[in-house]
Amino acid sequence: MARYIGPKLKLSRREGTDLGLKSGVKPYDVKTKKSARPPGQHGVSRNKSSEYSLQLREKQKVKRIYGVLERQFANYYKEAARKRGATGENLLAMLESRLDNVVYRMGFGSTRAEARQLVSHRTVMVKKAGRDEFIRVNIPSIQLQDGDVIAIQEKSREQLRIKNAIELATQRGIPEWLDVDHSKLQGTFKKAPDRIDLPAEINESLIVELYSK
């Protein structure tokens, strides 16, 4: 399955909620004011959604939020199921612990897609907990561990898009499970987030039900 490169707002309209795929400069409800209906000629279906369709839709929504493809998502689920604790919560914690997502959460990218691009272009450096040196990385899916430090490399620190992203993050707020110093353009991954720290609009139990069939 190829990565979607079409209009991002259309995906949010299809799911009926803001997936965070756009920068957030203009509020989601303003951008969709002309039509809150899903895209397409007929908009909302009159047929009641089946249990399976609701489960599948929730999986699609989460995949789109984090920019993860089908096989990769299935692998995350398998790993989450092997871990101790609630599978759905483990799944979300793993997705939130991805390097590209943390770069976004820290405010160095205005969207996850932009954060992913920063990582792919080797703009981001990581210092593993207990190590003394930063290393440049280009793999967005790296799973961060407690105490890992992220920084923007020196020659990229004046990029306008990074400065704009920090302004947006200041308005959005930084999660409690991260410690960020925007003046130094670096931050620490303190720990994986608990469920209370994660997006409330996600119903991970539907995804667990889907994979349990």
From Swiss-Prot:
One GO MF term attached to the UniProt entry: rRNA binding
Q: Pfam families from the xrefs? A: Ribosomal_S4, S4
Which PROSITE patterns does the annotation name? RIBOSOMAL_S4 (PS00632), S4 (PS50889)
Q: Where is the composition biased (Polar residues)?
A: 44-53
Which residue intervals define the domain S4 RNA-binding in the entry? 97-163
| Stored InterPro entries | Ribosomal_uS4 (IPR022801), Ribosomal_uS4_bac-type (IPR005709), Ribosomal_uS4_CS (IPR018079), Ribosomal_uS4_N (IPR001912), S4_RNA-bd (IPR002942), S4_RNA-bd_sf (IPR036986)
SUPFAM superfamilies under this entry? Alpha-L RNA-binding motif (SSF55174)
> Per UniProt, which keywords does this protein have?
Ribonucleoprotein, Ribosomal protein, RNA-binding, rRNA-binding
GO biological process per UniProt? ribosomal small subunit biogenesis; translation
Annotated region (Disordered) at 16-53
Any one GO CC term of this protein is: small ribosomal subunit
Assembly and partners are described as:
Part of the 30S ribosomal subunit. Contacts protein S5. The interaction surface between S4 and S5 is involved in control of translational fidelity.
Family as reported in the entry's similarity comment: Belongs to the universal ribosomal protein uS4 family.
What role does it play?
A: One of the primary rRNA binding proteins, it binds directly to 16S rRNA where it nucleates assembly of the body of the 30S subunit.
Concerning PANTHER family, the annotation shows: 30S 40S RIBOSOMAL PROTEIN (PTHR11831), SMALL RIBOSOMAL SUBUNIT PROTEIN US4M (PTHR11831:SF4)
This protein is called Small ribosomal subunit protein uS4
Query: Which gene is annotated as encoding this protein in its UniProt record?
Result: rpsD
